[in-house]
Amino acid sequence: MAINRSITPTPELSVAAAQLVRVADEGSARHAHLVALLDGSGPHAARDLCDAVHLLCSLHGRYPGLMQIALQRCGNGLARDWLNKASEAFERERLYLVRLTAAVGPLPSTPGAAETEASLMSARNALETLANSERDGCALGAATALVCDWWPVRRLLDRAAARVGTEPPAPSLPDEASVLEVVDGATQTPGSARALAFGGEQLLLQHRALFDLLEARAEARADY
């Protein structure tokens, strides 16, 4: 089960730097199941990879997603400019994910389908809540965490694409420097800094929970 943790900015660690540390420490790249999927050496690697693509699409393949909702609710300024670019870039990632989901074949038969769908619905609702949050900084925290945490996810998608002969698009998400700039520029109060941290933590929590679910489904299929 995913555990919610907190990283607090210090005089030596800015709000933006704390966000990057948060993603590095709590993000998908450190999850054992993602590491195993990228390694791809197990006897059921292809099936597990297919399952991961399908569940990622269930979480992030719908429109509008977190980025678009956050952009719609954001006022003018630095955060809106960044979200506009991030939203356009993530839409390309979403379309890639949808196309790849069709290419990898059907969702692997796995016990506990109803429980899986309930977990995914809860995760989608959580992301929508973050994107719609009225707390200044919360949606931006979730959006910047999503962009930063997408890179290990993108490596997973590209591995699946290589298996089925699908050409991946060139990555176009905002880089780390732009994340630092927008977080530093948009969090001018302690309240907005706390809200940004909360949004980031909750996004990463949902990603870890997704890989927990994928790991449990892989184990269930092994006994099926």
Residue ranges of model-derived segments:
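Acidic, carboxylate-rich catalytic segments that either coordinate divalent cations
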Residues: 2, 190-224
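Acidic, low-complexity proline/glycine-rich segments
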Residues: 2-36, 115-118
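Short, charged, low-complexity loops and linkers
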Residues: 5-15, 39-50, 133-135, 159, ...
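Alpha-helical bundle segments that constitute or directly flank the non-heme di-iron/ferroxidase center
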Residues: 22-29, 36-74, 129-133, 137-154, ...
